[in-house]
Amino acid sequence: MKKSITTLDLNLLLCLQLLMQERSVTKAAKRMNVTPSAVSKSLAKLRAWFDDPLFVNSPLGLSPTPLMVSMEQNLAEWMQMSNLLLDKPHHQTPRGLKFELAAESPLMMIMLNALSKQIYQRYPQATIKLRNWDYDSLDAITRGEVDIGFSGRESHPRSRELLSSLPLAIDYEVLFSDVPCVWLRKDHPALHEKWDLDTFLRYPHISICWEQSDTWALDNVLQELGRERTIAMSLPEFEQSLFMAAQPDNLLLATAPRYCQYYNQLHQLPLVALPLPFDESQQKKLEVPFTLLWHKRNSHNPKIVWLRDTIKNLYASMA
């Protein structure tokens, strides 16, 4: 017999949603500010109402049953509609609203002014906190310290930064893909030589220390070819490497995403971009999908959904 919703405590659906997001009674209890015992009792009521276990224990936490998986999207949509309904009586620009982002620089800097204008237009009292993407950023998203991350991942099969290696709790959307190129000053002697792998490796390189590593997919590809570049300088950000590569009489080469042309135009750096001297299959391994990342619990959060859409529209021209 079909059950009536009037026989169900709707607060239990919030508990169910949080259990689906967190896959943990303890974590769901923490978010609800109740004890794990209270969440366990709520889960027991839900199991009785749906006549299904809903979750089973596994080494990775609570694993949803087929029925629970089938309800996930509908439950999320119901929660989003509920949030929108409850938000109606409130002012659309609440005081104290914060937007916290972790982003690769200069990726965010080229659109930061436009993004901040749109945020303040919609939420005049909002504050924006921007931090550089680093080794702790994914954990910061999980901890709830960051609303959205915006960073490049890697495509090399041996990379630790593959999209498929992201934690299960992280959702993402690729906004555009980029293949890095070599940046060198306009009067660099390499511009008077045949541009090939030997020329590329003849000069000293600037490396970016990315998530506590000085090497990345480029070095993996070189290793496969039995070659190695000379890293003369290691810096934390791409814009610093571009600045150093642009200095007069500097022989250093910087390898950075092609999107950096926007940054160079803004700052009028005297740099020339050359393609990495690899064949098509090797270039494919160097492709960088630039990706928005957020925690699954925020997938239907109206503020986060709006922020994601706004960033996506700003970077649409780079796709």
From Swiss-Prot:
Pfam (any one): LysR_substrate
Domain HTH lysR-type: 8-65
Main function: Involved in anaerobic NO protection.
CDD domains, per the entry: PBP2_Nitroaromatics_like
DNA-binding region: 25-44
Domain of life where this protein originates: Bacteria
InterPro entries assigned: LysR-type_TF, LysR_subst-bd, Tscrpt_reg_HTH_LysR, Tscrpt_reg_YidZ, WH-like_DNA-bd_sf, WH_DNA-bd_sf, YidZ_PBP2
Family: Belongs to the LysR transcriptional regulatory family.
A GO molecular function held by the record: DNA-binding transcription factor activity
Official protein name in the record: HTH-type transcriptional regulator YidZ
Organism in which the protein naturally occurs: Escherichia coli O157:H7
